[in-house]
Regions:
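Helix-adjacent hinge/juxtasegments
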Residues: 57-97
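Hydrophobic alpha-helical segments of small multi-pass membrane proteins
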Residues: 79-92, 106-119, 135-142
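Membrane-helix boundary connector in multi-pass membrane proteins
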Residues: 96-101, 117-133
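Cytosolic, membrane-interface loops and tails of multi-pass inner-membrane proteins
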Residues: 24-44, 152-165
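Helix-coil boundary and interhelical linker segments in multi-pass alpha-helical membrane proteins
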Residues: 1-8, 61-77, 121-131
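Membrane-interface loop-to-helix entry segments
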Residues: 43-57, 100-112
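Terminal transmembrane helical module of multi-pass membrane proteins
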Residues: 125-165
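N-terminal signal-anchor transmembrane alpha helix
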Residues: 1-24
Length: 165
């Protein structure tokens, strides 16, 4: 039997968290980010919202499947790892778009990448291949986004009067 309130919370936390980050940085995307030198393989801006929404929903559903197997008490370690990577995910947006700190955004994303692997590894014994099916696209996208972040860092030197490593 589906625990509807738990499912709704598990889905809404990542999706709404991502939406808040997106709305909070919309001005920077149209201003600062638009002025950056970008690689030919940079996706169009309109693609980020739908991709992240799907990924957030998938990870939320994966967390629900784990939660369903005994709640926080029984699944404390996998859910703690998941929550930690989600916090790092949410932290990346202000590091990159608000503070313009490519260096800190890269460190954040590297730690997040490792924690996504740990999330998959700890979810898999609980929910089987659902963990791979739901979270592997997220890992692939974060790998791509990490490469993009590093490319932007290397190819967009800080402007005079702006602090950036």
């Amino acid at each position: 039997m589906v625990d509807v309130p738990a499912l709704v919370v598990c889905l809404l936390v990542p999706v709404v968290g991502g939406m808040i980050g997106g709305f909070a940085t919309a001005k920077e995307i149209k201003g600062w980010y638009a002025g950056l030198k970008k690689p030919w393989w940079n996706p169009p801006n309109w693609l980020f919202g739908p991709v992240w929404t799907c990924l957030y929903a998938a990870m939320g559903y994966a967390s629900y499947l784990v939660y369903e197997q005994g709640g926080f008490k029984a699944q404390a370690a996998p859910l703690a790892i998941y929550i930690t990577q989600l916090v790092l995910n949410f932290a990346w947006t202000p590091l990159f778009f608000t503070l313009h700190r490519f260096d800190l955004a890269t460190v954040d994303m590297t730690a997040m990448w490792g924690l996504i692997i740990a999330t998959i590894a700890t979810f898999r014994p609980v929910i089987g291949n659902w963990a791979l099916g739901l979270l592997l696209p997220y890992l692939v996208w974060v790998t791509y986004a990490s490469a993009l972040t590093i490319w932007l860092w290397r190819n967009n030197p800080a402007k005079k009067g702006k602090k950036r490593a």
